[in-house]
Amino acid sequence: MVRNKRVPHIRGTVEEAVRLARRWGADEVLARRAGILHDCTKYWELEPHLEVCDKYGVELDELERKAVKLLHSKSGACIAREVFGEPEEVFQAIFWHTTGKADMTLLEKILYIADYMEPCRKFDGVDYMRKLAYTDLDKAMLLGVNMTIEDMRERGVPIHANTLGAYNWLVEHGVTLEE
């Protein structure tokens, strides 16, 4: 299901998700399972993603129908639930780990952030995110969502409405990146 080069990222995401779950009082077993399966369909071609989403009743917007990078979270969540029997919490965490959304659960935030900052990730700001993730999870979320939005704008790529929704929700609930 995944390529060998992806294994270190998956392991890193699992380890980070478990550490974050322990820090924030979430279910470590569910965090581990979500981390293991979060990229299980990452390397599929477009058509299998669409088929799985259609089979399991996942409604896709126009942007998702064209973007494999967005689709892997939706199809991966379906495989986690329907093939591996994972519970709804794991399904939802995997489902939202790419775009984020407004009003995310603790497990959803943990997987989103663990995937973003696992030890193999190297980019400007990742060390600050790693610090924030253990002191203020919502600030870490805002940083990640903000970095995604900036990256998409710089590359001229459409920003998914759910990513903007995550950003707006956090800001509307008083989360800032100010010290």
Where are these regions (language model features)?
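Divalent metal-dependent catalytic cores for phosphoryl transfer on phosphate-bearing substrates
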Residues: M1, H9, R23-L143
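Charged phosphate-binding loop/patch that engages nucleotide di/tri-phosphates or the phosphate backbone
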Residues: E150-E179
